[in-house]
Design a protein with these regions (language model features):
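Cysteine-centered catalytic environments shared across enzyme families
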Residues: 2-321
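Adenylate-forming
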Residues: 327-333
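Acceptor-substrate binding/catalytic loop of class I
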Residues: 324
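Conserved small/polar residues in nucleotide/adenosyl-binding loops
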Residues: 336-338
Length: 338
């Protein structure tokens, strides 16, 4: 998934201006993640940068986001699915500056301090800088849908980046920022914020199967992820997973979920996309599913040689040699270039 990109440098005690060039270079390395906007904020002890791919509020949702009093600065890569509910709850406590779904993070922090992450329903990696207090908070979503890496240099600077390449040459030590964790500068350590009973199989192994509950939960999950101010489509392989999620998306695509189905969507029909070798069985299956659910279907072919030629770029972007991930990502890179 390509979304926005964030980079940040914290623990700056010898003048942020000296590190501005580094911060810009870190952000430039991940600019492919955000073609719509590049932004940077330089504070007393931190620099935050953002590369934006617009999904919600394209006109005014540029980042870094800044609170009305100018004391809180935020960079986010992600989507907050329950932002409308949170806005309604917080509107008396915070003056929202944009329509961005991510601005609710600033409002929550202002009201609750760091004890708000459980309030978020979404996928995210964010860095929040409280300039007045001189502290910062970094967090990642429960299962790590959104990528984030953390690194340190020999001068004690802490850095984060959506991709490893943003830290290369600057950090002497770096590692993945753990899913479901946050880092608060006052604590100086990673802390798990997301924990559930079902993480221990012993707690759920005897639970009865409830097919209707599974159906309702899956449909609700797909529906809330259709929140968008720009056109969207579905990737359809013809397999069970993509067929089910595409069918659910098609069910709700005609109306804007942001209005609880009261307003028509801005695009008349859901488009589906499938890519593969010519005459591949998956393409045939995807075509059948598209016909059955009624999407405008696009079938793209690529050759084995084109796949081999793309390998270097694929590995550069996904930053892993894992065979399964490389195999799945190769046709996806060809698809997004069309």
């Amino acid at each position: 998934m390509i979304m926005c990109g964030i980079t940040a440098i914290f623990n700056i005690h010898d003048g942020a201006q000296a590190l501005r060039k580094q911060a810009l270079l870190m952000s430039k390395r991940i600019r492919h993640r955000g073609p719509d906007w590049s932004g940077i904020y330089q504070g007393k002890t931190a620099i935050l940068a953002h590369e934006r791919l617009s999904i919600v509020d394209p006109a005014s949702g540029g980042q870094p986001l800044v609170s009305p009093d100018g004391k809180l600065i935020l960079c986010v890569n992600g989507e907050i699915y329950n932002h409308q509910e949170l806005r309604e709850r917080l509107k008396g406590d915070y003056e929202f500056q944009t329509g961005s779904d991510c601005e609710v993070i600033l409002a929550l922090y202002k009201k609750k301090g760091i004890d708000f992450i459980e309030d978020l329903n979404g996928i995210f990696a964010f860095a929040l800088y409280d300039e007045e207090k001189g502290v910062y908070l970094i967090a990642r979503d429960p299962i790590g849908v959104i990528p984030l890496y953390i690194g340190y240099d020999d001068e004690g600077h802490l850095m984060v980046s959506s991709e490893l390449k943003g830290l290369e040459g600057f950090a002497t030590h770096y590692e993945p920022f753990l899913p479901g964790h946050y880092f608060y500068s006052e604590d100086r350590k990673l802390t798990r914020w997301y924990t559930r009973d079902w993480m221990d199989y012993a707690n759920v192994k005897d639970n009865p199967t409830d097919v209707q509950q599974l159906h309702d939960a899956l449909e609700a999950a797909v529906k809330r992820q259709l929140m968008s101010d720009v056109p969207y489509g579905v990737l359809l392989s013809g397999g069970l997973d993509s067929s089910i999620t595409s069918a659910i998306a098609k069910k709700y695509a005609a109306k804007r979920i942001e209005t609880n189905g009261k307003a028509d969507a801005w695009w008349p029909q859901l488009h589906s996309f499938a890519i593969g070798l010519k005459d591949a069985p998956d393409l045939l299956a995807a075509r059948k599913v598209a016909d059955a659910i009624g999407t405008v279907h696009h079938e793209i072919h690529y050759t084995i040689q084109e796949g081999l030629d793309a390998l270097r770029d694929v590995i550069y972007h996904i930053e892993t040699y894992d065979v399964t991930t490389v195999r799945a990502s190769t046709p996806m890179l060809s698809l997004i270039h069309i």
